[in-house]
């Protein structure tokens, strides 16, 4: 029997393989590394919609890939919740993924803070 985690990993590999035709190997590698970080980081976390956080992040990334967004935007989408789960997220993302991905995640985080503030 295949576990949900094994099935999820296989689905991610299949999706990444499909991306290889649209991106250079280094770009696909950046997206793959984002998935590798997000997998354990988001494990067991649930979105407000009730969906697993990783599933939500990958679904959003898949939509953006279909819109021909760049690899850094796709990686940032996958890592959008990192500030909630990593104390040193800014330094880590900049070191591992570059300044652009870090800035995009920071922007997503700020938009979420604004959304939460507006609900008060």
Task: Go through each PLM region and give its residues.
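Active-site helical microenvironments for divalent-metal-assisted chemistry
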Residues: 1-120
